[in-house]
Curated annotation (Swiss-Prot):
InterPro entries: DNA_helicase_Holl-junc_RuvA_I, Hlx-hairpin-Hlx_DNA-bd_motif, NA-bd_OB-fold, RuvA, RuvA_2-like, RuvA_C, RuvA_C_sf. Belongs to the RuvA family. Residues 139 are annotated as: Flexible linker. Homotetramer. Forms an RuvA(8)-RuvB(12)-Holliday junction (HJ) complex. HJ DNA is sandwiched between 2 RuvA tetramers; dsDNA enters through RuvA and exits via RuvB. An RuvB hexamer assembles on each DNA strand where it exits the tetramer. Each RuvB hexamer is contacted by two RuvA subunits (via domain III) on 2 adjacent RuvB subunits; this complex drives branch migration. In the full resolvosome a probable DNA-RuvA(4)-RuvB(12)-RuvC(2) complex forms which resolves the HJ. The keyword Metal-binding does not apply. The gene is ruvA. Keywords: Cytoplasm, DNA damage, DNA recombination, DNA repair, DNA-binding. It comes from the Bacteria. GO terms for biological process: DNA recombination; DNA repair. This is Holliday junction branch migration complex subunit RuvA. The lineage of its organism: Bacteria, Pseudomonadati, Campylobacterota, Epsilonproteobacteria, Campylobacterales. It is found in: Cytoplasm. Signal peptide: none annotated. Residues 139-185 are annotated as: Domain III.
Amino acid sequence: MIVGMEGIVERRDPTFIHLNVNGIIYEIQVSINTSNAIQEKRVKLFITQVIREDADLLFGFMDTNEKKMFDTVLKINGVGPKVGLAICSTFTPETFAKVVASKDVSMLKRVPGIGPKAASRILVELADFIVDGNAAEGSSGALGEAVMALESLGFKKDAIQKALSGCSGDTSTLVKEGLKKLQRL
């Protein structure tokens, strides 16, 4: 599973980039917010990989909160990567959390591909979606990356935070420590 990529931007469009990673050029789907945030030729993106029968798709994000938002909406029945990316292009994670908290169906219906029925389902299923302030602070650091890696392995966020409390070190050290502690929980 690919969780991150670093390389040189060969081509940039509003909804995708071509990223040269050691001579191999990948097409990575991005939100408009991520596309606008790319200012340098060399970038590091957090990746969600979606493997289907007919395609192997990469979705890239500059911000871990945006990646978390994308991954969360993908878990909702009837919401695919296209709609997930449209949500990420329409809202920042903070704005999306406010829309969900206020149960604002009309705001959610502004997203291309979301009608009243889908908007209601999203609001019901994401009632507890919050942008974690602590995760936002450490999202670019080792702790945020370790939490993201452990979540991608299927562990619950509460258990991960419990396991990583009091731990320090680089990302790989934190992931190893987290796995050891999570096996005991």
